[in-house]
């Protein structure tokens, strides 16, 4: 078993830092090297699966949450639900809008074909920044009848206030900076 400090060090060692992306002054954290490393991906999957213990369904947020969500779901022996950006799913859908810095966005899940009532759902994503997307995902799933039990992310950008935005939802971040 890998402890939290070892996982945080692993994430740090396999995170590529990109200066001034996507705009000047931003220090982008690229997790692609972590996902491309078999041992790194496996250990991160194990840690996120432990955080999602008790879930009967994993919800992965568009887009890199899909990768992690599927891996965690397989590890736990449960299904995975892709939470999509608006316009990517055929109708009917459940939708949830949320605020962006300049405007709004929406997330969607199928309204037919997946019964969420009574399902214990854990949300998985790559990075927690402001928390807007994760909080909207939790609202969307709850509105559709799910019992959202937890959220897990690989990397939390602590200064951006995401943890407070998703409170009181239990949140596990494998590395916080």
Swiss-Prot record:
It is found in: Cytoplasm. GO terms for molecular function: adenine binding; adenine phosphoribosyltransferase activity; AMP binding. Its EC number is 2.4.2.7. Catalyzes a salvage reaction resulting in the formation of AMP, that is energically less costly than de novo synthesis. PANTHER family: ADENINE PHOSPHORIBOSYLTRANSFERASE. Homodimer. This is Adenine phosphoribosyltransferase.
């Amino acid at each position: 078993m890998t402890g939290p400090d070892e996982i945080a060090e692993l994430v740090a060692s396999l995170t590529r830092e990109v200066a001034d992306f996507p705009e000047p002054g931003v220090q982008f954290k690229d997790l692609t090297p972590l996902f491309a490393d078999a041992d790194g991906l496996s250990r991160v999957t194990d840690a996120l699966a432990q955080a999602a213990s008790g879930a009967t369904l994993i919800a992965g947020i568009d887009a890199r949450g899909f990768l992690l969500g599927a891996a965690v779901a397989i590890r736990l022996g449960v299904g995975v639900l892709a939470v999509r950006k608006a316009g990517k799913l055929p109708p009917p859908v459940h939708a949830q809008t949320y605020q962006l810095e300049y405007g709004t966005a929406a997330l969607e899940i199928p309204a037919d074909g997946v019964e969420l009532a009574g399902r214990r759902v854990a949300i998985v994503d790559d990075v927690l920044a402001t928390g807007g997307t994760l909080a909207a995902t939790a609202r969307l799933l709850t509105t559709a009848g799910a019992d959202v039990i937890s959220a897990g992310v690989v990397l939390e950008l602590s200064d951006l206030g995401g943890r407070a935005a998703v409170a009181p939802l239990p949140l596990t971040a494998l590395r916080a900076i």
